[in-house]
Amino acid sequence: MMPSSQRPSPRGSRQSPSPDQRGRIAFAILATLVVAVLLLTLFSHAPSGQPLGYSTFIHDVQAKQVRTAVLNNTTGQITGSLTNGTAYSVTGPLPYTSSELSTLSKAHVQVSYITPGPGIASTIIEYVIFFGIFIGIWVYLTRRTQGSVNGIMSVGRSRAKTYTTERPKTTFDDVAGYQGVKGEVKEVVDFLRDPSRFSQLGARIPKGILLVGPPGTGKTLLARAVAGEAGVPFMSVSGSDFMEMFVGVGAARVRDLFQTARRQSPSIIFIDEIDSIGRKRGTGLGGGHDEREQTLNQMLSEMDGFDPAEGIVVMAATNRPDILDPALLRPGRFDRQIVVPLPDLPERLAILQVHTRGKRLAPDVDLEVMAKGTPGMSGADLANLVNEAALNAVRRGATDIAMADFDSARDRIIMGQRREATILSDEEKERVAFHEGGHAVLAYVLDYSDPVHKVTILPTGMALGVTQQLPERDRHLYPREYIEDTLVVRMGGRVAELLVYGDLSTGAANDLQGNTELARRMVREWGMSERLGPMAWGSQNVVFLGEDLLHSAEYSDRTARLVDEEVERILREQEERATELLRQHLPGLIAVAHALLERETISGEEVGRLVDEAAGHPIHPDGKRVLPIAKLPEYAELEQFTVTNGNNHAASHDDTDPVS
């Protein structure tokens, strides 16, 4: 896949030299003239006759062997003839002294003087320098003028890059997993390659395909794979490339892009981050016209307007489909909206296999185990994981990548980089140990919480300590028990400090913030409040101009007060649960805290062993409870929701930093 270049001119046609070539030719001619003049000057001033030393010349004068002497007042050169007729030349000092002239006069030498003006060589040099400077200034100003004119005239031209399939860099084989997504995209590619197979049944090619999904899931990679396999011109452009400081530039670039695509039809246009120009239309902050709207209107007209584009497929990618204009999403423009979700376990394994291809792996590396331990990671996260593992192997001087490198890379991505320079006092380290121990103990004893993977009191990322949990499987639906246990685990650090020290620190700031947001979503969005019942008001997203700026509250002040009361009730109930559980397992909390103070980092298995030994019996003799089948929701069409940030990343409690 290479950027297309200009077509070669017909054989035998003469092409005018480019400005750079003309500049090089002029420089070569000027340099040749300068060298010629210098050589001419050198040879024109070469002395003639037998060269003599100045002392020898004075001796010959005193011996009356010199007949004539011509003195050059400019160069100090003396030429003439001896009494025997031999010509000579000598260079004397300037100015000539009276004693020297008296010596010549006493010897009866015929003396004459010359004061030559500037020679032809000097004149040529002066003219060459003058005209060289003039030509240089003229060329510079000409180029500046042409650049300004070209810049102004080309401001409305599209910045799309056109690719051919002579050397495809990315194919569908490089896109691991996502068989359903690749099937949807391959159908469009097959249509462009062989449209007759579809037109026999009256099928028409989709005009637009919108790739929707979280960041890093491979939407742009799919587009590059289409460019590598389509066999038709593929034009790639970013949504931000349409916008410029001049009014009307965005619409002009849209027109130019589609005109170029029509000339090369059938073709594919890919617009990355289309939400930068496709945002919902509405009144701006000052009531004025938005340049983005003009660009969007031109895009709508080109895709399916009075003069629709035929033989052109528009692909676009975004992770914000909720803010796109409805007119852009209707059938006839973007006929298909393909969701590119976070990869599941088999897809994560396939992605890891693709990114480890060509890398030297140690025998102990098990990619399936690593795929199970990375739920919620996108394809970009997994690529970064493999690269971090390779860098870790290089840092320790190994010749291959071991499983320990992958574990270290995963911890670095989820928990953050360890801060070697941060040194805690003994009192701070002990408080952090009990704080993280509270998280870890509750995560172990609760039935529905995610298992503990690792606990550390080493300053990592922005935190002073981290308790890392890894889900046992990919979750697509979250029961109420899981959400409540998540609230209890987050309360563990705060409650542990209260039980051990009798007071609080700033370490629980992130815990409280996350719990408050989660409890508010339970009440506002998921209908998990008996007092408010089955009502939902949506999340409090960022305000977008022209859409949410003038919206009023969706509920009354009384309802808002009820929401706050229910959020407070949920948080206090889960805090009481956390307090009761930690009082029951206080010996286990002390054992875990002492282990952290001794070794600084312990595994989830060691946390379970310490808690079981302190309790005198296994807390989970048959393993952790899972959600019974009978309690699963009966309606498959229930909308999936997520607990935090819309994804299923491994949880980590990194909230013991006072900065938070």
From Swiss-Prot:
Which segments does the topology annotation call Cytoplasmic?
A: 1-24, 140-660
> GO molecular function of the protein, one example?
metalloendopeptidase activity
- Tell me its cofactors: Zn(2+)
Per the UniProt record, one Pfam family is FtsH_ext
Going by the record, the broad EC class of this enzyme is hydrolase
Keyword Protease in the entry? The reply is: yes
Q: How is the cofactor bound?
A: Binds 1 zinc ion per subunit.
Residue span of the signal peptide, if any?
Answer: none
Record's GO cellular component terms: plasma membrane
Q: Which UniProt keywords apply?
A: ATP-binding, Cell membrane, Hydrolase, Membrane, Metal-binding, Metalloprotease, Nucleotide-binding, Protease, Transmembrane, Transmembrane helix, Zinc
- Note the superkingdom of the native organism: Bacteria
Q: Where is this region: Disordered?
A: 1-20
GO annotations under biological process? protein catabolic process; proteolysis
Q: Which residues lie on this side of the membrane: Extracellular?
A: 46-118
Similarity remark: In the central section; belongs to the AAA ATPase family.
Q: Any idea what job this protein has?
A: Acts as a processive, ATP-dependent zinc metallopeptidase for both cytoplasmic and membrane proteins. Plays a role in the quality control of integral membrane proteins.
The record, for PANTHER family, names: ATP-DEPENDENT ZINC METALLOPROTEASE YME1L1 (PTHR23076:SF97), METALLOPROTEASE M41 FTSH (PTHR23076)
Quaternary structure, per UniProt, is: Homohexamer.
Protein name, please? ATP-dependent zinc metalloprotease FtsH
Gene name of this polypeptide: ftsH
